[in-house]
């Protein structure tokens, strides 16, 4: 698998130069304190990770449960958080970013936890690839919810023991977003996670999936307590966004830099 990934890296990084301009600009603006040499090193390591991630995701179609849990494991404290929520018969929301191998993290959760995992996603326009992604994500029991149906489906599932996962680092429409500084840039953040959590009073668990070595990841979890009342909108959003920012700074090569995350300008 990883010999193939090394070949794909040469193709993607050196020959096709896939989104090199977007990645370089994102890195330079996110880390103004780093030298050009340091930026290039992060960029190269990112493309190696990106190629590994691409092939690891397809490996989901054939990997066994035993091997899945071996390659993407829970920290003991992480398992304890999920087990305690199950004992309390408490559904909750998962917040995470495009960091590490989020697909494998979802697989391991579905294998190891009592909660039924639902993942919020955008259906792809290409029916073939949408079907392929659906098979990969649901192979170990995970279920998918289209983003437009999120609140409705969560309310319909309130009698069940569920965990609903949100990827929080996508790019919302600027006039409906919460704006804050993220990686040294003015950034729109989804407020929907915070609004839903407060509406249905579900706990939030922030998850990070750290790359330990090539092909191996460890899942860390932290429970974010909901305040009884908010003095201002955005408090919870800022908490989980700062957690992600800290994770990215600690392992900058393991975040998805190919996205045009900062394509929107703050409305005046």
Question: PLM features: residue spans?
Answer:
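Membrane-anchoring hydrophobic helices of lipid-metabolizing enzymes
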Residues: 1-96, 130-135, 141
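Generic structural "secondary-structure junction" signal
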Residues: 18, 63, 74-76, 101-104, ...
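Soluble or luminal CAZymes and related metallo-dependent hydrolases
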Residues: 19, 74, 146, 236-239
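Hydrophobic alpha-helical segments typical of transmembrane helices
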Residues: 23-26, 105, 132, 192, ...
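Short polybasic/polar patches that bind polyanions
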Residues: 25-29, 111, 138, 198, ...
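Non-catalytic C-terminal accessory region of glycerolipid acyltransferases
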Residues: 37, 41-44, 83-87, 112, ...
